[in-house]
UniProtKB/Swiss-Prot annotation:
Residues 37-82 form the F-box domain. This is F-box protein At1g47056. Signal peptide: none annotated. PANTHER family: F-BOX_LRR-REPEAT PROTEIN 8-RELATED, PARTNER OF PAIRED, ISOFORM B-RELATED. GO terms for molecular function: ubiquitin-protein transferase activity. InterPro entries: F-box_dom, Leu-rich_rpt, Leu-rich_rpt_Cys-con_subtyp, LRR_dom_sf. The lineage of its organism: Eukaryota, Viridiplantae, Streptophyta, Embryophyta, Tracheophyta. It comes from the Eukaryota.
Length: 518
């Protein structure tokens, strides 16, 4: 009897469950939604690809899982690809580049603890990416000169080549220069294998006419690239970071031909006034960075200012050497009337040079001073009274006080942003007062309490970025134009709206919209 009662109860319960399930999820409704047409099927592949270009990488991957057509369209229209270049990547190359057969920008990065791809993998990639325009290699230590030579022969349309922390040598870079006639940008960082190479072994090759930008960083024998720098007929940008050796003679040889260089960046380089005097013959120079070059003095800066009258952007990190000061800055003010951005770190200007800069450089919009022991309230008051075009001002670790801030509030009518950091004489209440007096002014200032907290954190981290100052780049044609990436041209409004569709099916949405209209 107990068993029969239990069976009867279970049957009743099952009928109730099935009834409730039928009421909540009618089968007819599910079938009607499935039978609705896919309105995206009439959308041309070109339009679908255009929609994909507004999505980030994660959303594009999700869209590729919707159906086979979307996966094909997404793969055929992906031009930028970044891969972990571990050794096991070689097994995935055929399938990977069969799907992404239109890649023009490729980044191969490997971490320090893994074994990177070798020559065989790089050659396979080059055979499947004949139209490659940009290649970036990071920590691919298994690559050799042989692999780079084979790659250069297969990808002759390369425009941008960047490599860092790799172990191939000068012959690999030379192969790229000898085969890629359209090469515009060359960036070499932390490469080994240059110790026994004579400088004449690396020339510009077929890239002599196309090369526009050269960046060398942390190279033991970077002078090997001297013929490349001198032989680049249309060089516009030269950046040298922490490369050993004396560079005065090389810069003299480069400037003698004056190819129209508009940007030079020298950081922790062994250069002197001899090099600066040579750079002064680059009459088209618009941007100059002198960062921790202790042998450069007022004489070299004055020589550049006198002949480079188009200078618009000047960054000087004097490294507290006190070799660049009022004399050099007065020359800049006298001859460089188009100056728009000035950054002084470890330099000691006074009202003499600052007053001249304010009076002569009427287009000065961005000014930053860091660790300037002579920049006090009189200097700040001078800037406030004489710089009507100034828009952005950054002061860090300078002996200013609340008096200077009060004078700043009454001057610089075009000022939109002020940043004050580690200035012990400025109290937090003064910054709040400045926000009240100038409500349209963006004020970024630390209080005394925040200053002590930052000092403690810098002691833990090491304070390596104590003097870091950033400004947006000028709207000039300093760098050679590269192929525009689809991700750079996204519309922010459309991107935020299309993000709502990530992770959901578009077909049921269209069917529900049609049913609602009925």
């Amino acid at each position: 009897m107990g068993q029969s009662t239990s069976a009867a109860g279970n049957s009743i319960l099952n009928r109730r469950r099935s009834k409730s399930f039928t009421l909540k999820f009618p089968i007819e409704s599910i079938e009607s939604e499935i039978s609705q047409p896919d309105y995206t099927s009439s959308l041309p592949d070109e339009c679908l690809a255009l929609v994909f270009q507004f999505l980030n990488s994660g959303n594009r991957k999700r869209c590729a899982l919707v159906c086979r057509r979307w996966m094909i369209v997404e793969g055929q229209n992906r031009y930028r690809l970044s891969l972990h270049a571990r050794s096991d990547l070689i097994t995935s190359i055929p399938s990977l580049f069969s799907r992404f057969d239109s890649v023009t920008k490729l980044s191969l990065k490997c971490d320090r603890r893994s074994v990177s791809i070798g020559d065989e993998a790089l050659v396979k990639i080059s055979l499947r990416c004949r139209n490659l325009k940009r290649l970036k290699l990071r920590a691919c230590r298994e690559l050799t000169d042989v692999g780079m030579a084979a790659f250069a022969e297969n990808c002759k349309d390369l425009k941008i080549f960047s490599c860092g922390s790799c172990d191939f040598g000068a012959k690999g870079v030379k192969a790229v220069l000898d085969h890629c006639s359209n090469l515009e940008e060359l960036s070499i960082k932390r490469l080994r294998g240059f110790t026994d190479i004579a400088p004449e072994m690396i020339g510009p090759g077929v890239a002599a006419s196309s090369l526009k930008s050269i960046c060398l960083k942390e190279l033991y024998n970077g002078q090997c690239f001297g013929p490349v720098i001198v032989g680049a007929k249309n060089l516009k940008s030269l950046k040298l970071f922490r490369c050993s050796g004396d560079w005065d003679l090389l810069l003299q040889e480069m400037s003698g031909k004056d190819h129209g260089v508009v940007e030079i960046h020298l950081e922790r380089m062994q250069v002197s006034d001899v090099a600066l005097s040579a750079i002064s013959y680059c009459s088209s120079l618009e941007s100059l960075h002198l960062v921790k070059t202790p042998e450069c003095t007022n004489f070299g800066l004055a020589a550049i200012a006198e002949k480079c009258k188009r200078l618009r952007k000047l960054h000087i990190d004097g490294w507290k050497a006190n070799l660049i000061g009022d004399e050099g800055l007065v020359a800049v003010a006298k001859f460089c009337s188009q100056l728009q951005e000035l950054v002084l770190i470890g330099v000691n200007p006074t009202t003499l040079s600052l007053g001249m800069l304010a009076a002569k450089c009427l287009n000065l919009e961005r000014l930053a001073l860091c660790g300037c022991d002579t920049f006090g309230d009189p200097e700040l008051s001078c800037i406030a009274a004489k710089c009507p075009a100034l828009r952005k001002l950054c002061i860090k670790n300078c002996p200013i006080s609340d008096v200077g801030i009060e004078n700043l509030a009454n001057g610089c009518p075009g000022l939109t942003k002020v940043k004050i950091k580690k200035c012990k004489g400025v109290l937090g209440g003064c910054a709040d007062w400045l926000r009240t007096v100038r409500p349209m002014l963006s004020v970024n200032a630390d209080t005394m309490e925040q200053e002590h907290e930052e000092a403690a954190s810098n002691d833990v981290v090491g304070g390596s970025q104590e003097n870091g100052i950033e400004f947006p780049q000028l709207n000039s044609q300093i760098m050679a134009s590269s192929i525009a990436s689809s991700s750079r041209n996204r519309s922010g409004y459309f991107k935020s709206g299309i993000g709502l569709f990530s992770g959901m099916s578009l077909v049921p949405c269209t069917s529900r919209q049609r049913r609602a209209s009925r």
